[in-house]
Amino acid sequence: MNDTFLKACRRENTPYTPVWLMRQAGRYMAEYMEIRNKYSFLEMCKTPELAVEVTLQPVRKLGVDAAILFADILLPLEGMGIGFRFARDEGPVIENPVRTIVDVKKVRVITPEEDVPYVLEAIKILRRELAGKVPLIGFSGAPFTLASYIIEGGGSKNYIQCKRLMWEAPEAWHELLGKIAESTVRYLKAQIAAGAQAVQVFDSWVGTLSPEDYEKYVLPHSKYVFDNLKETGVPVIHFANNAGSMLELVAAAGGDVIGLDWRVSLDRAWQTVGFDRGVQGNLDPVALFAPKEVIRQKVKEILIKAGKRPGHIFNLGHGIHKETPVENAQYLVEVVHELSSLSYEQLLEA
């Protein structure tokens, strides 16, 4: 079995730096589009056989060191009593946004086996199909990011409704985030029970907050999630996008591995979160549109900053873009494996 990813999560030595890509199963791949042209996005998520096939495509095509379940962070919402749909080119639309204490009271905590059985079934099939070739990562949204969709009614630039509820009705805010946090714990524990060998918690939009607001309104709920996952013994990755101004707080919330975006310098960020945990990242996803020699140089720079310290997982600083040339994604995996196999002295000369 290729267990380099799991070893890196535990900060053990590996022969090379493991690499996988956020959103690695996606629209930049022709194989994905063949399926996507026949089915809606939600049909793909809710049909285990399709989710399995799409999860496996980048493992076969790119040679990545981990598979990540094909799903969406909003899937648990239906079980919480919140309807949503995906509008073409618009992203998710929440049908009944939560904006008052009355709305919050109606939100339920999920029962994963009843509410998202298709996710758990896909994980079970994937473990059989992967047959130990690479580990399988499960995932969920973080409490703040899920709350931002639920309150705003979809994606947002300024998060006005979200921040308004947070500041005007803190009791309602904390009750809502408490329910989301408990749902997240149940969801991830169910994924782990079904066979996920690591999980990632995506806090994609938390960068909209000041460090003070994060600490007061979000950190306790994120910490609840990470504290409750410790007993599973499975590595947990905490990815907080655009959170360079509050990495100490993100690390305080928890996670065995802290995911970094490209806006921070990996060496300084690792020092900030502490060498007692791993880091994941952190190539700018747009670098995959650059010439191969530029990709190679950027990979080299990141690996030098990691300094051959055990516990680095190579990834992009956010999801891969849909227009990315697939051959550049393949090249990225090759060059990470090649350069990270060198000694530090050889890497400097490469």
UniProtKB/Swiss-Prot annotation:
GO terms for biological process: protoporphyrinogen IX biosynthetic process. One of its GO terms (cellular component) is cytosol. Keywords: Cytoplasm, Decarboxylase, Lyase, Porphyrin biosynthesis. It is found in: Cytoplasm. Its EC number is 4.1.1.37. Pfam families: URO-D (PF01208). This is Uroporphyrinogen decarboxylase. Substrate binds at residues 23-27, 72, 149, 204, 318. Gene3D superfamilies: 3.20.20.210. It comes from Carboxydothermus hydrogenoformans (strain ATCC BAA-161 / DSM 6008 / Z-2901). HAMAP family: URO_D. Pathway: Porphyrin-containing compound metabolism; protoporphyrin-IX biosynthesis; coproporphyrinogen-III from 5-aminolevulinate: step 4/4. Its main location: cytoplasm. PROSITE patterns: UROD_1, UROD_2. The gene is hemE. Catalyzes the decarboxylation of four acetate groups of uroporphyrinogen-III to yield coproporphyrinogen-III. It catalyses: uroporphyrinogen III + 4 H(+) = coproporphyrinogen III + 4 CO2. Coiled coil: none annotated. One of its GO terms (molecular function) is uroporphyrinogen decarboxylase activity. Belongs to the uroporphyrinogen decarboxylase family. The record marks 72 as: Transition state stabilizer. The lineage of its organism: Bacteria, Bacillati, Bacillota, Clostridia, Thermoanaerobacterales. Homodimer.
